[in-house]
Amino acid sequence: MNLENYLPVILFILVGVGVGVAPQVLGFLLGPRRPYAAKNSPYECGFEAFEDARMKFDVRYYLVAILFILFDLEIAFLFPWAVSLREIGATGFWAMMIFLGILVVGFVYEWKKGALDWE
C-alpha cells in the first residue's frame, strides 16, 4: 500500500484544522484582557437577569428534537434511494421497504407511548 496517495488528504485536513484553530489562538493571544464588573455580569436584553439562567426544560423538547433527527435522517437516506431506484432494482427497493417498515414501527411505538402528546 502506497501512503503517498494520502498526502493530499492529510494536507487538506491539516489546512482545515489550521484555518479553524488559528483565529481562535490568535484571538486568545492578542485579544485585550480587561475584565470588569459590568463585563462579567449576566446580560438579558438590557435588563438585569430576572431569574436563574439554569432553568429546567421539559423533557418533551429533547424528545421532539431526537425524533426530528431520526426522521430527518430517514429523509437523508430516502432521497438518494429514490434517485437511484432504477439502478438498484428490486433488491434495493425491498431493502428500503424494510428500513421504512422499521421506522414506521418506531413511529407508531412513539405515538402509542404518548411521546407526541403535549398534554
Swiss-Prot record:
Transmembrane stretches, start-end: 9-29, 63-83, 88-108
This enzyme's EC code(s): 7.1.1.-
Membrane-topology annotation of the record: Multi-pass membrane protein
Reactions this protein catalyses: a quinone + NADH + 5 H(+)(in) = a quinol + NAD(+) + 4 H(+)(out)
EC top class, as a word: translocase
Compartments where found: Cell inner membrane
One Pfam family of this chain: Oxidored_q4
InterPro entries: NAD(P)H_OxRDtase_bac/plastid, NADH_UbQ/plastoQ_OxRdtase_su3, NDAH_ubi_oxred_su3_sf
Family matches, as Gene3D superfamilies: NADH:ubiquinone/plastoquinone oxidoreductase, chain 3
GO cellular component: NADH dehydrogenase complex; plasma membrane
Keywords, alphabetical: Cell inner membrane, Cell membrane, Membrane, NAD, Quinone, Translocase, Transmembrane, Transmembrane helix, Transport, Ubiquinone
Main location as per UniProt: membrane
Molecular function via GO: NADH dehydrogenase (ubiquinone) activity; NADH:ubiquinone reductase (non-electrogenic) activity; quinone binding
Family: Belongs to the complex I subunit 3 family.
Subunit structure as annotated in this protein's UniProt entry: NDH-1 is composed of 14 different subunits. Subunits NuoA, H, J, K, L, M, N constitute the membrane sector of the complex.
HAMAP family xref list: NDH1_NuoA
Purpose of the protein: NDH-1 shuttles electrons from NADH, via FMN and iron-sulfur (Fe-S) centers, to quinones in the respiratory chain. The immediate electron acceptor for the enzyme in this species is believed to be ubiquinone. Couples the redox reaction to proton translocation (for every two electrons transferred, four hydrogen ions are translocated across the cytoplasmic membrane), and thus conserves the redox energy in a proton gradient.
Name of this chain's protein: NADH-quinone oxidoreductase subunit A
The organism of origin for this protein: Leptothrix cholodnii (strain ATCC 51168 / LMG 8142 / SP-6) (Leptothrix discophora (strain SP-6))
